[in-house]
Amino acid sequence: MKTSFKLVLFVALWLVPSHQCRSQTIRGKVYADTEAAFAANVFLKHHTDIHAITDEDGQFELPLQDGILPDTLMVTYVGYKDFVLPLTVQNLPDSLTIKLLSNAISLSEVTIMADATSSKEFAVTKLSRLEVLMSPSASADPLKAMGMMAYSTPTTESANPELRGSASGYSRVVVNGVPIYKPVRNQQLDGMGNFSLFNADIVGEQYVYPSNPPLEYGNATGGIVNIRTTQRLPEGQHTRVSASLASIGAFHSFKMGAQSFVQTYANLQSSELYRPVNAKGLRHLKNFRSADVGLNLHTQLSKGMHLNLFSYYINERYAANRGLFNYRGEQNATNKRNFNILNLAYSTSWKNSFALNTATDVASTHYLFGSITDHTQQLSTFVSLAWKHCLTENLSVAVGLDNEYLRYKYNGEYPSAYFLVHPSNEHNHRKATSWMNKSEGYVYGKWQMGKLSVGGGVRQMVSKLFSSTLSYQASMRFSPNKHNTIIASFGEYNAINRPTYYSRTFNKAFSRQASLDYSFTKGNGTLSAALYHKRERLPFLSPNLQEMLPIAQRITGIEVSGKYSWKQFTAFACYTYLMSSTFIDNKWQRAENDFGHTAKAEISYFNMKLINISLNCMYHPGKYFTPIIGKHDVGTQPYPVFGAYNSEQLPHYLSVNLALNKYMQVGKTAVVAYLTLSNILNRNNANYTYYDEQYANPLIEPLQKRLLYFGVVVNF
């Protein structure tokens, strides 16, 4: 603890601002035609970390430090020409009135890629790259940026999206129209992972549908996180290097002509420094190491035709202690994965646009734990073709077809029953291949009638493994004025789950749900509320029968959240009441996430001249679980005896976290130093239970305790 305290003190002193730095603030108002431009991006061309977003009145404040000029002020807004103003010390204005000029050609070109989704209006949340980077709790991770939202109902400290009571495996992350399964790194046996695979610098837009996922995308019964990569860059080249307690990384982007650009990045992660500093907070962790590289290429092939290629490769391994059933030991995992997404978009006019999306995903994993020695090779391909036709300016229809092929090859030593994981238990060698090919088609229509938007669609899924299924949905968005918005949706959804360790087969999932969302925005304040209900039919592993069975689940939730900004402070709080039950043993019983009351809060202080500080807190009751009350021997093998379903509960979860960062200017170079302190209270938050070898005593495996993390980012 003394070492950690010294490091905190050292970094905190480093973050203290220098009194020799002088600063000035540019204030202004941005107009799009005659209306105030809401959410326009304002930034410096050569120092993109100095940025602001206009409020609903089009106003912004941009703090500058001495020595940063000369530079160029940039204002970007979709559908309008970029505003460019050279800045020098001599001509630095105190205030600006900026009037953006319409750019019909630019709007048409942007629409090809960015507006390919007809159902955008029905998303509950939209996050931009800047919002992901500025979120104190996100750690610049696009998926973790949702963690503080009211609709995020996690049962673990994971980057996997768990939306409105649905388990993470039933929500989909879609990137440029392509579903990305297992979108996390450091993935464990239960499918959970610590960080997402995506770099925030390549994210252009991120839409979140926490329930009633749009039928333009399939195979989701929970929700959808729809990520669109960057489609426009400011002029010039941008380079960023970073170093932290556990990683080093680099990012570089440059334009190739007016409509083409390249973004590339690479990272190396290692626990060599991270684990010794946090030895008391990470007792289960042995080591980890990973290397990843990504490329995003966007180019204009001809007038109205754009191509985008996003390619990603990761090589990772980790070792950590884990407890499962009656064994606790070291688990070792390695993973090599490469996925590629190619998008071709073509627009003949504002009335017609076409999109072709293709993807490949190849992975090879090794996993060792107890009696398990697993080698899995995964291959998946995806192709979709979509056509969007605008019958009028307010009425559109989208039609699409997609095909997905999945193949898993398993080879290794596996226990004869899923709970016989102790190394001394009976296990045998197995080799198998599972595959599935499915095709889906959809029709989606949208009609805008002034302040009211109505959308609806159907989606048909066909596969040789299962009978044909039909999904449908309808949505309505009503905005009586600029302050109030109501979104109502209902639908019925079908999906096919991929194999897991507990089930090497494909299984069907079904959900019928309805949701009502309301938001109020005025000035610096936002108030949101939601009510939703789901009835799901999901595959369930019967502990006694040792096979997958379909069971019913119902989820009801109420959400209330508020956000308010004043001067340099921002406060956010949300409350969720979640009821979740499962129909098992011929009666409704509580599900593991039948939390009832949950709450989150965050307060932040942003001051580019001094320091940025954020403090957040998350609380929810502990998970329910089915206890093991004894054992009986089958031959020489110990079989657990399970108690009443979800009759016991883990202690409640409470985590308080601190984040600090400081912006500094060194000549023409921008430097951001940051520090985070997780679980400040050093609580023993419970992760799961396991047992001794005789199943006599239950043991609780804790989550991470207090952790220190710090680093620096340098922008050229």
Regions from the PLM with identified roles:
Residues Y619-G635, K662-F716:
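C-terminal beta-signal and adjacent terminal beta-strands/loops
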